[in-house]
Amino acid sequence: MARSVDSDVLVIGTGGAGLRAAIEAKERGVGVAIVSKSPAGMNNATVVAGGGFRAAIEGLTPEEHYRDTMEVGKRLNDPKLVRIFAEEGGERVLELRRFGVEMRVHHGGVSVGTIPTLRGLGITKPMVKHCRSIGVEVVENVVVTKLLKKGEAVVGAVGYDVHVGEPVVFSSKAVVLATGGAGALYKRTDCPLRVTGDGYSLGYHAGARLRDMEFVQFFPIALAEPGEPPFLIGGAITEEGRILNTLGEDIPKKYGLTARPLVLKSRDLLSRAVMMEIAQGSGVSGAVLVDAREVFRRRNVEYLAYTGPVKYLLEKLKAAEKPFRVAPICHFCMGGLVMDENGYTGVPGLYAAGEVVGGVHGANRHGGNALTDITVFGARAGASAARRSRRVKAKRVEELAEAEIRRYEVLAARDNGYNPYIVMERLREAMWAKAGIIRDSASLAEAFEEIFDLRGMAERVMASRGRDMLVALEAPMALDAAEMIVRAAMERRESRGAHYRSDYPLEDQKWLKPVIISEADGGAMHLTT
């Protein structure tokens, strides 16, 4: 027996974009439900973000913010979206204080959070609390696997409660997708393992178009010591320290990287340079070195506290005494659903916001822009969904969910088959090795073949426990997202921003256009430019 959740607006995802959309819709006087496949506000990219918002605040002008964003995005961004983003960003970021978010204001943005590796909790925790206080219905531990359509319109969704072990059917007049990106498709990532690209798949199968899926951003400097967490390293440690190969060569100097701060303005170039050094044999077990000994001698710990897990580096790794290993890590997806300035995807009833959307960041993202993005377009998508919910009537959706519920039942009853964790592990290995920072035609073809093989395995997985069921239901959606990344990377025969092909190493003005993905009649993935 399925549980029913009815609302005017359904928001899928409880990261910053989803929470902001839910608050905006609720404040406009409509009934709102928000669903998360984990505890609300947890296991999303917002939580592990560095806590920095870049916006037109304290001296940075909207025009400067617009120009920087377009430049870093290699002008593949949608200029209309970027203009709104730059002009509204400052006000929207400061507005978070109204929802209980504490922040430190500085030139060009704000910073939040106090836990070095989980600064984003300073965003999601108070916003979840605010959602509950204003009457948003919060549904937790439910993985949504399909959007329900009546005719051309999205009228709800269906998912599975992995704690209780029952289907959940959502009826709504409008849906906001805010499921985040797909960083967990890669072996090395700072994203939680639940960031598996669900929204790309959900939107795609509901008829939405996607763009820029080939552009996956890798943070260039993250801890790569054996057995240690892959913490991001930035700030003074990377700007004032030395990033070295085994020959003692300074890698940024060797590759002529001068834009500063490196990890904000040159993420793609530095990531590529590090991986080239590793590929050429000038690394250490898949890593290079950061020598921050002089930094720790000159700077006090309080100054360095915002640059990464300083206490961990000093006490566990003895970073004041010797260099430590680092390597790039998958951090963000620039591509996603095509939307207009109000979060509308072109599918009636379906809106989107946050990392699941493409167009704002173009070919590469400027550091600090992701969190500003979720506030600006989360609010806009929530407002648009609320407006639609006032002018349409609710539809009965139970019959629309029947086929998906039967799929859950078959999966739960299967007593032999493949382990879903193995499917996801193989996918992450393939994406890291074949569709990561340095790509070419051959490696992408190998990644595509692996995805094809894994699809067959994913159809025959078994899931005897709730957590197994979660991974089993994530796997087909993750494979959709992975195929989009690989297919788009195969299509774009140039190098631009975060997309680098060693067989097409130069930027080509003919490719100053997005690769668009849609589902063709019969279910095939269709690409156009």
Locations of the language-model features?
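An anion/pyrophosphate-binding glycine-rich loop and adjacent beta-alpha core
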Residues: 202, 208-322, 375, 384-391
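Conserved redox-cofactor binding core of oxidoreductases
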Residues: 42, 92-166, 171-174, 178, ...
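Dinucleotide-binding Rossmann-like beta1-alpha1 core, especially the glycine-rich loop
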Residues: 68-91
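FAD-site-proximal beta/loop scaffold in flavoenzymes
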Residues: 146-164, 169, 318-360
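Glycine- and aromatic-enriched mobile tails/lids
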Residues: 5-7, 16, 24, 28, ...
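Conserved N-terminal glycine-rich FAD pyrophosphate-binding loop of Rossmann-like flavoproteins
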Residues: 38-68, 231-233
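Short beta-strand "acidic-cap" motif of Rossmann-like dinucleotide-binding folds
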Residues: 31-36, 212
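Catalytic-site beta-strand/loop segments enriched in glycine and acidic/polar residues
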Residues: 9-15, 169-196, 351-365
